[in-house]
Regions:
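C-terminal catalytic/substrate-binding lobe primarily of soluble NAD(P)-dependent oxidoreductases
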Residues: 134-353
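NAD(P)-binding Rossmann-fold cofactor-contacting core
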Residues: 27-39
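Rossmann-fold NAD(P)-binding glycine/threonine-rich loop
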Residues: 93-113
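Gly/Ala-rich phosphate-binding loop of Rossmann-like dinucleotide-binding domains
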Residues: 17, 21, 83
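Hydrophobic/small residue at the entry helix of a nucleotide-binding pocket
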Residues: 12
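Conserved N-terminal Rossmann-fold NAD(P)-binding element of oxidoreductases
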Residues: 4-8
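NAD(P)H-binding glycine-rich loop region in Rossmannoid oxidoreductase-like domains
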Residues: 48-100
Length: 353
């Protein structure tokens, strides 16, 4: 089994570290607050500033692969530093800066980086890329995704299943979309509309900046990503922002995750070809004994990418790679693993042709 170094032990990072340890890998976990992975068999904990430990990981033994699960800009700084290594890096971090700008540096140093390996972006990219290969060129591509309580609980009707800081950034960063075949920038939280989420009924969707790499890699006439929340949540955010009453420090507390409240993650990916053919997938998870739904849905994609790369060391060359470069076989493996772990995924089977 491999030696895997996991950076960041938040809700998602801890799930991935535990998952990889349960699969038999030797895991080194790094975090300033590593309490979620303390005392877990197969995990060696390194407490402290992760950025200070990046280039000394080899002092802790073999490094077969690095998994970056640090939040926001800290995660981006870690990936930028790791581009100056010879490591294989699976990068779940999310910030306004994307790792592809470090592609030349990674090639020069010999690093291989696979980025945006969550549910969306991540699995959403893979499904859109599969649709493009199967029925493309695409007329329209859309992603709806959200992790929410199962009902509109509390004043905000929301709790953050990952870093609240990243959620705030998601709500404020302008959304890059495709319109008439060209990339344009629209204000986040616009194009609000209702979407049917099945058993949870009608929820509200709005534009966010989650397309990232597919803006360049998948040609389409129109492409959008929407975040899904309970009605009333985003209007409250907008009202408090416009009145000047929005306090980000308070939001971090008010949106904190409460494991006693039932929650779910839901995603729909829809691709329409220029001749009218449609491929559509729906993903839903309600969590389990091993973690909450967003940690599971996101973490399974991350862990499966780690597993696939360990099994096939030549899966990716040096440089920086987006998830849509992964082949149909890897996508199928990820979907199969998620289904085996009771994540509902409805939609067309991934063909190997």
């Amino acid at each position: 089994m491999a030696v895997v170094h996991c950076l960041g032990c938040g809700l998602v990072g801890a799930w991935v570290a535990k998952r990889l340890a349960a699969l038999g890998h030797q895991v080194h976990a790094y975090d300033i607050l590593p309490h979620r992975v303390m005392g877990i068999d197969g995990i060696t904990v390194h407490q402290g500033d992760v950025l200070d430990n990046l280039m000394s990981m080899s002092n802790n033994g073999q490094v077969d692969i690095v998994v970056n699960m640090l939040p926001g800009d800290i995660g981006h700084m870690a990936t930028t530093d790791l581009a100056e290594s010879r490591y294989r890096v699976v990068d779940l971090s999310f910030s306004k800066h994307t790792p592809d700008r470090d592609n030349q540096k990674a090639q020069d140093y010999g690093a291989s980086i696979l980025w945006d390996v969550g549910i969306a972006p991540g699995l959403s990219n893979m499904l859109l890329a599969y649709a493009d290969r199967a029925i493309g060129p695409l007329e329209k591509a859309e992603v709806w995704v959200g992790g929410n309580p199962t009902g509109p609980y509390g004043e905000w009707k929301y709790m953050a299943p990952f870093s609240p800081i990243d959620v705030i950034a998601e709500y404020t960063r302008p959304a890059r979309v495709i319109r008439q075949g060209e990339e344009v920038v629209l204000p986040a939280l616009t194009q609000r509309h209702m979407v049917d989420t099945g058993e949870h009924g009608e929820m509200e969707a709005f534009l966010t900046d989650g397309l990232r790499s597919v803006l360049k890699s998948i040609p389409a006439v129109e492409m959008s990503e929407f975040t899904v929340r309970w009605p009333g949540h985003i209007q409250k955010f907008i009202d408090e922002r416009e009145s000047g009453d929005l306090n980000e420090d308070e939001l971090i507390f008010e949106w904190s995750y409460d494991h006693k409240i039932p929650e779910f993650t839901w995603m729909k990916v829809r691709a329409q070809s220029r001749n009218g053919k449609i491929l559509e997938w729906e993903v839903e998870d309600h969590g389990g004994d091993d973690g909450h739904s967003m940690a599971r849905a996101t973490g399974m994609v991350t862990a499966c990418c780690v597993e696939a790369w360990l099994k096939n060391p030549d899966m990716l060359p040096v440089g920086v790679h987006a998830p849509e470069v992964l082949g149909n076989h890897t996508i199928s493996q990820i979907i199969r693993a998620m289904k085996l772990n009771n994540v509902r995924i409805d939609g067309p089977e991934i063909s190997f042709e």
